[in-house]
Amino acid sequence: MSITLFTRTDFRGDRSTITSDTPSLAALEVGAHPSSAQIAAPTGAALFFRREHFEGNALYRRGPRNIADIGKAAEGGKATWGNTIASVRVSPFQLQLNVSVVSEEDGTLPGGFTSGQDARERVAAVVALANTLLGNQQALITLDVSRFNVRQNDRKFDVNMPRLAAYPPAWKEPGFVDVVVCNQARRKGQAGVTKPPCLGQVLLLAARLRFENPLSGNEQTVNLADDLMAVTLVHELGHYCGIHHPSGRGGATNIMNPATAEFDPFNGTFAGPALADLELDEEQIGDMHSSLAGARERDRR
């Protein structure tokens, strides 16, 4: 993959070509003020940051792509950006997950988890699927289960008010994404809850879902399968990184559109679009990375 930067708009003027992560453009011929860019690779993506060392707001674009004017959305760039790009990233950032699976004090585990080892393996499978979804989108984000604990707590096994829930300090790890897997949220239809940057640190996933059967009208519960939990994890990661439901623009395959997360009420599997068709658009991914370079900057590696 190669990216060619130009000092002037419309691919004119002096140029510099980069093929790897470049934490500072200052030493290149174009310096830190390129005005246009070309991403030559048929696959691959790039993050253009306004500050050195991959800091500041991020502009994300997939290849192949011609950006005739970095400061104009209509020309492939972003309004208000001008020619202020100071660093470029082409390899993924890693987010380390600190996972707490909540059991009752008698040892009962969430959802269909049968043992601590089974919970560990299921979480690993969910994260692997989430990484596939992110990889399909060339999101330049990978997830790693770096900490895993089963924690006994009757009060956190089923979460009554997920948006107001607080968790013990011992469950949190600075520099990690704190993920809590509970049994279920009391609110029907809720498979996960996460607050945006500056409002919360915990990404909550449920292993079991309460819902109203549309045929009988009766309330039911179902254990969630790995694929539905993975879609929920990526959706909640979006919230964690500051993007919200409207960012999906109602797209039938957009991961941030709540209507996309359809499920089979009999086995808890994902019943929405094919996993390979689920998407995050360029602006959503760019906004996620802007949060990871800002309010969530301690979480990325």
Segments from the language model and where they lie:
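Structural recognition of the beta-strand scaffold that forms the well-ordered cores
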Residues: 47, 97-101, 143-144, 178-181, ...
